[in-house]
């Protein structure tokens, strides 16, 4: 049977815009891209002073279409209000939704980069985002916000360009990737490598390592949720005579990802996450955290097994101008993509108490949102 060729452009909005940069990009670990492209979406208008911009940073397999995957946070009077702000979300370096990555054509060879795409880091992602914002005329970020991988980017923005960022929100993330997360990422990569079509990453577009990438996604989905959420949703219910509903759910999630994502991009992006460490080449980790004095909201999820609450508490303890936010839910890491109304209320509560530019938060007491079924209190 003939395999269909992956068309990643079918999985991001027709409203996506592109910025092309013809100058070489030297990456943190020494690799170079001769040129690069950034896919992005924007909402609202940039003001004359260029300082009403908000940057949204997406997670691992996300796209620039934040108005789709974070839709409840958009609208007048909400976190992302395009009547007041200029909101930007760009696809990260190394992804496959329009920004240069392993699935892109190498202009020097005329072929896909594939596994030869150079190693990159969260800092490289942020540098590419800065290039985009410069091209758009942004002079200062009113806020940078992201969850998971997006939160890593938000923190790096504070460390790399502190004078460019007014406030930041980090959700379900950490200042450095733990051995636990690195191990789980490697298990997923090994699942991809075990696919007979992997071929060291030199697979053809017609025959990608679908089984391996699907298995990787199934592993990941188990870490994005919790035992309690699986028990509540599936328990031991059957889909068919010998198939549990939870098995069917995981198979479906795996199949969905292989239709929309590139395996090499998945490998490279998870490796970039594993390299995440705010203190790399900057000195003592805690001193680095102490140096980040931008007004910050650090949001934890009580049931997150990937980035547990103590990691966010540590950030708040050492960052001198940070406030702690908590989402209570049984959904685990994915809560920030599920309980979005609650997240919107948390961020808005933080925004309402922000001090004048350059000042410290007057109130660092935690902001808490409790979610049980349809009940919500802030």
From Swiss-Prot:
Pathway note: Amino-acid biosynthesis; L-methionine biosynthesis via de novo pathway; O-acetyl-L-homoserine from L-homoserine: step 1/1
Subcellular location: Cytoplasm
Molecular function in Gene Ontology: homoserine O-acetyltransferase activity
Record's protein name: Homoserine O-acetyltransferase
Organism of this sequence: Chloroherpeton thalassium (strain ATCC 35110 / GB-78)
Family: Belongs to the AB hydrolase superfamily. MetX family.
Enzyme kind, highest EC tier: transferase
Annotated NCBIfam families: homoserO_Ac_trn, PRK00175.1
Source superkingdom: Bacteria
Active site per the UniProt annotation: 148, 304, 333
Gene that encodes the chain: metXA
A cellular component annotation (GO) from this entry: cytoplasm
Residues binding substrate: 217, 334
Residues in AB hydrolase-1 domain copies: 52-337
Record text on subunit structure and interactions: Homodimer.
Main location: cytoplasm
Keyword set, alphabetical order: Acyltransferase, Amino-acid biosynthesis, Cytoplasm, Methionine biosynthesis, Transferase
Biological process, per Gene Ontology: homoserine metabolic process; methionine biosynthetic process
Catalytic activity: L-homoserine + acetyl-CoA = O-acetyl-L-homoserine + CoA
Free-text function comment from the UniProt entry: Transfers an acetyl group from acetyl-CoA to L-homoserine, forming acetyl-L-homoserine.
EC number(s) reported in the record: 2.3.1.31
A Pfam family that the UniProt record links to this protein: Abhydrolase_1
């Amino acid at each position: 049977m003939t395999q269909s060729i992956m068309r990643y452009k079918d999985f991001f909005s027709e409203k996506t815009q592109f910025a092309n940069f013809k100058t070489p990009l030297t990456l943190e670990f020494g690799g170079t891209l001769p040129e690069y492209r950034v896919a992005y979406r924007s909402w609202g208008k940039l003001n004359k002073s260029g300082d009403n911009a908000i940057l949204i940073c997406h997670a691992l397999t996300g796209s620039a279409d934040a108005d789709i995957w974070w839709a409840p946070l958009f609208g007048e009077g909400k976190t992302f209000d395009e009547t007041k702000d200029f909101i930007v979300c760009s696809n990260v370096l190394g992804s496959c939704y329009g920004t240069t990555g392993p699935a892109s054509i190498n202009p020097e060879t005329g072929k896909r980069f594939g596994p030869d795409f150079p190693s990159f880091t969260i800092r490289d992602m942020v540098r590419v985002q800065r290039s985009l914002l410069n091209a758009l005329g942004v002079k200062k970020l009113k806020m940078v916000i992201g969850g998971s991988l997006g939160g890593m980017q938000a923190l790096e923005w504070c460390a790399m360009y502190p004078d460019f960022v007014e406030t930041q929100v980090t959700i379900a993330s950490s200042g450095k990737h733990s051995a636990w997360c690195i191990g789980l990422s490697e298990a997923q990569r090994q699942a991809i490598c075990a696919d007979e079509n992997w071929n060291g990453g030199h697979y053809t577009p017609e025959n990608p390592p679908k089984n391996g990438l699907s298995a990787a996604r199934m592993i990941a989905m188990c870490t994005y949720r919790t035992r309690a959420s699986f028990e509540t949703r599936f328990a031991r219910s059957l889909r068919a005579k010998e198939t549990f509903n939870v098995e069917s759910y995981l198979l479906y999630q795996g199949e969905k990802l292989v239709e929309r994502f590139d395996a090499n991009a998945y490998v490279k992006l998870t490796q970039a996450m594993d390299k995440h460490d705010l203190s790399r080449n900057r000195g003592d980790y805690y001193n680095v955290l102490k140096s980040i004095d931008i007004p910050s909201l650090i949001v934890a999820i009580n049931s997150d097994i990937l980035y547990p609450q103590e990691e966010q508490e540590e950030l708040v303890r050492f960052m001198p101008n940070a406030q702690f936010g908590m989402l209570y839910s049984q959904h685990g890491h994915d809560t920030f993509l599920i309980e979005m109304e609650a997240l919107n209320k948390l961020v808005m509560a933080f925004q309402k108490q922000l001090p004048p530019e350059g000042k410290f938060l007057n109130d660092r007491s935690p902001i808490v949102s409790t979610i049980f079924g349809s009940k919500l209190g802030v």
